[in-house]
Amino acid sequence: MKKIAVLTSGGDSPGMNAAVRAVTRTAIYNNIEVYGVYQGYQGLLDDDIHKLELGSVGDTIQRGGTFLFSARCPQFKEEDVRKKAIENLRKRGIEGLVVIGGDGSYRGAQRISEECKEIQTIGIPGTIDNDINGTDFTIGFDTALNTIIESVDKIRDTASSHARTFIVEVMGRDCGDLALWAGLSVGAETIVLPEVNTDIKDVAEKIEQGIKRGKKHSIVMVAEGCMSGQECADELTKYINIDTRVSVLGHIQRGGSPSGADRVLASRLGGYAVELLKQGETAKGVGIRNNQLTSTPFDEIFAESNRKFNSQMYELAKELSI
């Protein structure tokens, strides 16, 4: 292994820069040349590929976002398009590709490994949604979680002052981990997740019971994948006469300097990705399980049967929100 490339793809997440830094410096330490692909898979097509040096990743570990930039590239699903991308790697003698991103990014890496056996691919989970199988945590999840907690703590102050019910919408299309972990952390009265069928009438009854006990305000945490915050508010007011406000946290969840946990996770996974390439591994995603570094074949990561949901934590959150 003499040359590798690294790219960031899909939605950005805090800690991506730390992962790129770890990949770059681990590779250089092992006498491997590193190339940064700018603008994700689009950069592979456009040949926007540049050599990275030690200084290229200096002063990046604390920065949010990704200095390599990221872009959606739906045309990468087409075989002819992928051939062009593969040729851009081949002509530089690049033998390994590290892809930092989510599920869609992994699928692109798998295609490359299937269609060009001489290019090894390794995926690093970079998404705030924490929706990648094969790892307990994804890069960016902890930072986004802390952003939500800080925001909702402030929202609760004003909810308390005005005796209102706030519906807080957070990111999470298919995975409700942000809503679940944040909901437990801020003491949300109700958490609405895509993994659980929630009857809004039951939510209204729970809020009403709280009012009878003297509770003046409530927080309802909603993952965007099951319904919007406004839809939840509209449904609630069909069953109970309360003053509601909706707060959509939006892209603030993706930004900011990565937390210490995300910096450490990104550094460990980035270094491990290079070690796997050196060992000849390919078509795998790296992860952390029980604080141990692991790797999982892409096919297993994509399997719906392996999708994770912490039902015990959900039940605990319900018990503590009484």
Curated annotation (Swiss-Prot):
It is found in: Cytoplasm. The keyword Magnesium applies. Keywords: Allosteric enzyme, ATP-binding, Cytoplasm, Glycolysis, Kinase, Magnesium, Metal-binding, Nucleotide-binding, Transferase. ADP binds at R21, A22, V23, T24, R25, R156, G187, A188, E189, R213, K215, K216, H217. It holds the Pfam family PFK. Its cofactor is Mg(2+). Substrate binds at T127, I128, D129, R164, M171, G172, R173, E224, R245, H251, I252, Q253, R254. The active site is at D129 (proton acceptor). One of its GO terms (biological process) is fructose 1,6-bisphosphate metabolic process. Its main location: cytoplasm. ATP binds at G11, R72, C73, G102, D103, G104, S105. It comes from the Bacteria. Pathway: Carbohydrate degradation; glycolysis; D-glyceraldehyde 3-phosphate and glycerone phosphate from D-glucose: step 3/4. Allosterically activated by ADP and other diphosphonucleosides, and allosterically inhibited by phosphoenolpyruvate. One of its GO terms (cellular component) is 6-phosphofructokinase complex. Mg(2+) binds at D103. GO terms for molecular function: 6-phosphofructokinase activity; AMP binding; ATP binding; fructose-6-phosphate binding; identical protein binding; metal ion binding; monosaccharide binding. InterPro entries: ATP_PFK, ATP_PFK_prok-type, PFKA_ATP_prok, Phosphofructokinase_CS, Phosphofructokinase_dom, PKF_sf. The keyword Metal-binding applies. HAMAP family: Phosphofructokinase_I_B1. Catalyzes the phosphorylation of D-fructose 6-phosphate to fructose 1,6-bisphosphate by ATP, the first committing step of glycolysis. NCBIfam families: PFKA_ATP, PRK03202.1. This is ATP-dependent 6-phosphofructokinase. It comes from Staphylococcus epidermidis (strain ATCC 35984 / DSM 28319 / BCRC 17069 / CCUG 31568 / BM 3577 / RP62A).
